[in-house]
A protein has these predicted regions:
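Membrane-helix boundary/coupling elements in multi-pass transport proteins
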Residues: 30, 35-48, 106-143, 187-192, ...
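Transmembrane helix-loop boundary segments of multi-pass membrane transporters
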Residues: 91-94, 108, 171-201, 217-220, ...
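Structural signal for membrane-spanning alpha-helices in multi-pass inner-membrane proteins
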Residues: 74-78, 166-174, 202-209, 240-244, ...
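C-terminal membrane-solvent junction of multi-pass transporters and transport-like membrane proteins
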Residues: 144-152, 195-247, 278, 282-285
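Hydrophobic alpha-helical segments and their helix-loop junctions in multi-pass secondary transporters
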Residues: 1-13, 32, 74-81, 198-215, ...
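Inter-helical loop and helix-membrane interface segments of multi-pass membrane transporters/permeases
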Residues: 2-24, 177-182, 248
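TM-loop-TM module centered on a large, flexible mid-protein loop between adjacent transmembrane helices
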Residues: 11-14, 58-122, 141-190
C-alpha cells in the first residue's frame, strides 16, 4: 500500500500520533482497560506457599514484561505499518504480518489473540469468583456464595454466578449492534471501575502509612516514594476520567457509571436494614 517500514514513523507526527495530542490522551481509557486485573498479581502471589519470596520477584519482573510485550510490540507495529495503516476492525498484529507478506503468521497471531482474550476472561472470572467468595465469608454477600465443592474445594456457586453475569454481557450486542461502539462503551465502564478499585487501593495504602507506620517499617518489600507516587497516580486517574467527557461513547459510559454505585449503595443500605432487624429480633427473643 506504499508504506515503507521505517523507525522514522516513531518521530513522524502523522504516523505516531495521527490525531494529535488529543488522540494520545484519548488512548488512556483503552490503556487502563488493557491493564485490568494487574492488581491480581498481589492477590494471587499472596496465596502461594512463599509469598515473601515470590511477590517481590513477580512484581520486579512486571515492568520488563510490559516493555517487551507491550511497548516494543507497539514500536514494531508503528515502524512497519504506522498508525494510519492499522484498522480498528482488525488486530494490529494481524495487519502487521499481512503487510509483511506472511498471511500464515497473521492467522497464527489471530489465534493467539483469541486465546489471550480467553485468558483475560478467565482472569475476570477468577477475580469476581474470589471476590464473591470473600464477601460471603465476611457476611457481605449471600451465604450460598461461600459454599465449596466437595472434591475441588472451589466456590462453585460464586463461579456459576460470575459466568452467568459474563454471559449476560453478550446480550448487549442486541442493544448496540455496532461492535466497536459497544466495545468502547463496555471498556470505558470497565476502565472507570478499575480506576475506582485502584484508587481505593492507593487510598487504603495512604491510610495504612499514616495509621500503622510500625507495620510499614517492618515490611521487607517497600514501594520507593510510595506516598508521593500514590498521589501522582491518583492525579493521573482523575485526569484519565476527565478526558472521557470529550468523546460521545466514553461520555455515555461515564454518565452511566454512577448508576452502578447507586445500586451498590442501595444494596448496602438494604443489608444494613436487614441486619438491624435481625438484631432487634434477637434482642426481643
Amino acid at each position: 500500500d506504499g508504506v515503507t517500514a521505517s523507525l522514522s514513523h516513531l518521530t513522524d507526527p502523522t504516523a505516531f500520533m495521527p490525531h494529535g495530542i488529543t488522540g494520545f490522551f484519548a488512548g488512556f481509557q483503552i490503556a487502563i482497560f488493557s491493564f485490568t486485573g494487574i492488581e491480581l498479581l498481589g492477590t494471587m502471589t499472596a496465596e502461594t506457599r512463599d509469598p515473601q519470596r515470590i511477590l517481590p520477584k513477580a512484581i520486579n519482573a512486571l515492568p520488563l514484561r510490559i516493555i517487551i510485550f507491550y511497548l516494543l510490540s507497539m514500536v514494531v507495529i508503528i515502524a512497519v505499518a504506522s498508525w494510519p495503516g492499522v484498522s480498528a476492525e482488525t488486530s494490529p498484529f494481524v495487519t502487521l504480518f499481512a503487510k509483511a507478506g506472511l498471511p500464515a503468521a497473521a492467522a497464527v497471531i489471530n489465534f493467539v489473540a483469541l486465546t489471550s482474550a480467553m485468558s483475560s476472561a478467565n482472569s475476570g472470572v477468577f477475580s469476581s469468583t474470589r471476590m464473591l467468595y470473600g464477601l460471603s465469608v465476611e457476611k457481605h454477600a449471600h451465604w450460598q456464595f461461600r459454599i465449596l465443592s466437595r472434591n475441588t474445594r472451589i466456590p462453585v456457586r460464586s463461579l456459576l454466578f460470575s459466568c452467568f453475569c459474563m454471559l449476560i454481557g453478550t446480550l448487549l450486542l442486541f442493544l448496540v449492534p455496532n461492535v466497536m461502539t459497544l466495545f468502547t462503551i463496555v471498556s470505558t465502564l470497565a476502565a472507570i471501575m478499575v480506576v475506582f478499585s485502584w484508587g481505593m487501593i492507593l487510598v487504603a495504602y495512604l491510610v495504612y502509612r499514616r495509621q500503622r507506620p510500625d507495620l510499614h517499617a517492618g515490611s521487607i518489600f517497600k514501594m520507593p516514594a510510595g506516598v508521593v507516587m500514590s498521589w501522582v497516580s491518583l492525579l493521573f486517574f482523575a485526569f484519565a476520567i476527565f478526558i472521557m467527557i470529550f468523546d460521545p461513547d466514553t461520555l455515555l459510559a461515564l454518565l452511566a457509571s454512577p448508576l452502578w454505585f447507586i445500586a451498590l449503595w442501595g444494596f448496602w443500605k438494604l443489608k444494613q436494614r436487614r441486619e438491624g432487624q435481625l438484631t432487634l429480633d434477637n434482642q426481643s427473643a
